[in-house]
């Protein structure tokens, strides 16, 4: 089973084309036909139409489940570096491997996964590092997220090799995903990344 998370902001479906493309690429890779995306706005409960909503679609050949919930961003004040090599090139509904890695976060709020000393992603987001007025995202991601792709296309961020040894070159780290943009300011100083 696979998972697609789509942001609906005050009744507007954001970046839908990128999500459809990812579903189609996933289906092609695993040799099934991607199910069509239903009219999510018509399914959206009335009480959620004036807020930011997290829509989760679990699918394979057919949609197995569609859910909507009011979005509440996580409060992240520290990240723990965790060396691992999970296979997450496709957005699997089964996140056991990532949940297992979260058990290693210690006192931190979230993990920052590394692979051979290269920075990748958190357990729920891609990351962007600020260096002065420039923004960089690791070229060693686990999941090439739709928001990451959008920001790269727009030229707002640049891909770069980022290592645990080069973290001191940056001032802050932003967490981005379908629900979070750089402008949402879910960020923290790199000094809050724990070794």
Predicted features and spans:
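Conserved alpha/beta cores of soluble small-molecule-handling proteins
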Residues: 1-118, 134, 140-195
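Short beta-strand/strand-turn micro-motif
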Residues: 120-125
């Amino acid at each position: 089973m696979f998972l697609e998370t789509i942001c609906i902001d005050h009744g507007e479906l954001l970046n839908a084309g990128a999500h459809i493309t990812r579903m189609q690429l996933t289906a092609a890779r695993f040799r099934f036909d991607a199910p069509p995306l239903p009219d999510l706005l018509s399914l959206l409960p009335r009480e959620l139409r004036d807020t930011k909503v997290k829509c989760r679609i679990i699918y394979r050949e057919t949609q197995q489940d569609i859910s909507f919930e009011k979005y509440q961003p996580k409060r992240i004040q520290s990240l723990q570096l965790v060396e691992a090599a999970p296979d997450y090139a496709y957005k699997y509904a089964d996140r056991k491997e990532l949940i297992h890695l979260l058990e290693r976060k210690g006192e931190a709020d979230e993990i920052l996964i590394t692979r051979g000393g290269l920075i990748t992603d958190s357990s729920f987001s891609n990351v962007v590092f600020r260096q002065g007025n420039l923004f960089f995202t690791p070229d060693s991601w686990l999941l090439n997220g739709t928001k990451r792709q959008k920001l790269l296309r727009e030229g707002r961020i640049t891909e770069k090799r980022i290592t645990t040894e080069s973290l001191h070159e940056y001032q802050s780290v932003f967490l981005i995903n379908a629900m979070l943009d750089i402008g949402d300011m879910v960020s923290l100083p790199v000094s809050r990344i724990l070794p």
